[in-house]
């Protein structure tokens, strides 16, 4: 049976804008997904040491029903600071939850541990978050750059036997359309184990 799914770029998913901030020299960065009109979110936080911000807001029992951005970042827990820059830039553009005198952008964030890859003293900060939002909203890429960019700049895999055995990973994205329905995913792959092709076993 012929598939009805059409492969598209994640930037073609309506209602979302994407931007990267990359610090090649320090080996870290952040990626932002902006929903200017807000989007309904959900959350499933896993792992033994998650570095996350505002993810509990997405639980169904809570009152906030829209998220305005998701920030993926390097820098471990320090990288959560990038989300403050995302929120600051969105507020300056009037994007967020109206609360009377201003808008409060709902920015959820999660970070990977990449401090062992590049310069551990440099982490995505407020300015990095601002730059990523400006890339998303002012330049509006038609294709999301993938690989060693954004939140995937310092990502590695194969660390189970220690740093000496690891290899480079990065930022990946995929999207499909089924008629008018579009679904996309963006991920910074920073696994402890190896990435294996299920078709070749390599």
PLM feature spans:
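Alpha/propeptide regions of enzymes that mature by internal proteolysis
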Residues: 1-202
